[in-house]
Amino acid sequence: MNCRVAALLEKLRVQECTKSRPRRSNDNALAESKNGTVIRKHFGYGHIPGRQAERLHAFHRDVLAPHLNYHRPCYFPSEQVDARGRVRKRYRQQDIMTPCQKLRSLPGAADCLRPGIDFAQLDALAGACSDNEAARRLNQVRDKLFATIRAEQAGAA
């Protein structure tokens, strides 16, 4: 084996073991970053007993997911290729939108929706309350949920 082949193999080996690779989302890093920035922000880092899982799932499904999808703006990157051919991600002010707005902006997005769902229904969900009202509701329901969990844990102890 010559030096060039050895260098290529070494480069491949390092890429397979590295977890923080740009534009590679096929490993667990994407899920863990979501847990850190979205889930843990609202649920906290403390232990939550398994018997509370159904309540937390209902909160996530009925309150948190609609808030994130229809009312929380996100930056979406624009890719620009520089003179050397490297792809640069740029986060511009005009690229801020909710995930629902981003879905609508994609070509052929209507074909990706579930059967029986159209953008008029999604707009009705998004327009049911303002962004501030949705955030207020999220905080109220979350506080009530965790007060119930704390009361049950105190009663069980």
Q: Which functions belong to the PLM regions below?
A:
Residues M1-N26, L30-G108, C112-Q121, G127, ...:
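Charged alpha-helix within mobile-element recombinases
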Residues L125-A157:
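C-terminal non-catalytic accessory extensions
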